């Protein structure tokens, strides 16, 4: 878990089920991506991201929009039911192959793919840095920010992702969107203060293992939020929830921003610290999707430019978060 003035270990939250919500919503995802740019250590990498900060923040929500309009198999890449089937988080298989062997392909897919998606996207960012492709770097870094943010959202790491199992239905979007929208300034101020007391540093562990650390912590935080939620459905519930759990949201957002900045820094270092351009002309519309490296995990190899668009697949999960 994240410790102050020490290299960050991401703590994440992955959830499984059907939830009509965007993880952290636009407010939270933009906050995390923007803050990560500010937290990078002084140097060429920070200069590059500060020059593209508005794009990285504004397009932080793009992966959610993308999964609704472009790829039906994108949904499970945004969460992980780390407690699926009563599994203890520390006992959940750490490889996709092991997960499929334990649960079967259908169940494994419905339970989510987030930690491997983070690793896959991180590898794509390293490749983009090596290619010195500025557009790919900015776009892939933006997508990575979304996935890292998802991992730190407590209700993206547990099966009771919307409180249905405990009579608290609606808690997911209330925690990640409504509460943030109603208390944006306070949460941003507190999260930034926390983040500045943490250390952005090269991640020296395996990125998948790093993501699992985040998810394990997120699962714990989900149970804490559920315990503190009074379950009332009054119009003032956002205020009550903020008073009870606002500190958890602030901490997770701070940790997500530090984790993201650390992963950006690590990708740049692993690529050999290439020189970066002063300006980048990004395309309009949704940020370009990163290259998917693992065909089995991704639901198929990337489509070649001259291939016809395949017939749209049915969603692999009933979750919409």
What are these regions (language model features)?
Residues 1-9:
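Bacterial N-terminal signal peptides that target proteins for export
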Residues 10-18:
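Bacterial N-terminal signal peptides
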Residues 11, 149, 236-239:
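Short linear motifs at secondary-structure transitions and domain/linker junctions
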Residues 14-15, 148, 168:
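Preference for short coil/turn "hinge" residues that link or interrupt alpha-helices
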Residues 20-143, 154-254, 258-321:
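N-terminal, motif-rich segments that launch catalysis or mediate targeting to/interaction with membranes
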Residues 143-149:
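Functional cores that coordinate and move charged inorganic groups
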């Amino acid at each position: 878990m994240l410790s102050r003035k020490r290299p960050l270990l991401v703590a994440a939250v992955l959830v499984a089920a059907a939830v009509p919500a965007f993880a952290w919503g636009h407010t939270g995802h933009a906050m995390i991506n923007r803050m990560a740019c500010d937290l990078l250590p002084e140097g060429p990498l920070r200069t590059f991201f500060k020059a593209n900060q508005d794009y990285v923040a504004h397009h932080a929500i793009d992966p959610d929009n993308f999964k609704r309009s472009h790829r039906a198999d994108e949904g499970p890449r945004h969460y992980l039911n780390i407690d699926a089937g009563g599994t203890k988080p520390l006992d959940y298989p750490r490889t996709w192959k092991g997960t499929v062997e334990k649960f079967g392909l259908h169940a494994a897919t419905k339970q989510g793919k987030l930690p491997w998606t983070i690793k896959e996207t991180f590898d794509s960012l390293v490749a983009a840095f090596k290619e010195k492709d500025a557009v790919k770097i900015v776009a892939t870094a933006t997508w990575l920010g979304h996935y890292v943010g998802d991992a730190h959202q407590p209700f993206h790491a547990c099966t009771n992702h919307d409180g249905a199992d405990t009579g608290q239905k609606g808690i997911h979007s209330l925690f990640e969107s409504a509460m943030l929208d109603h208390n944006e300034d306070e949460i941003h101020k507190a999260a930034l203060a926390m983040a500045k007391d943490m250390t952005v540093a090269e991640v020296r562990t395996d990125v998948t293992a790093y993501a699992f650390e985040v998810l394990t912590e997120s699962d714990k935080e989900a149970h804490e939020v559920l315990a503190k939620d009074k379950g009332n459905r009054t119009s003032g519930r956002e205020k009550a929830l903020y008073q009870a759990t606002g500190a958890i949201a602030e901490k997770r957002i701070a940790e997500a921003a530090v984790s993201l900045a650390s992963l950006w820094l690590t990708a740049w270092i692993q690529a050999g610290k290439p020189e970066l351009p002063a300006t980048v002309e990004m395309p309009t519309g949704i940020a370009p999707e990163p290259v998917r490296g693992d065909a089995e995990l991704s639901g198929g190899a990337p489509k070649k430019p001259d291939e016809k668009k395949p017939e749209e697949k049915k969603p692999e999960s009933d979750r919409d978060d």
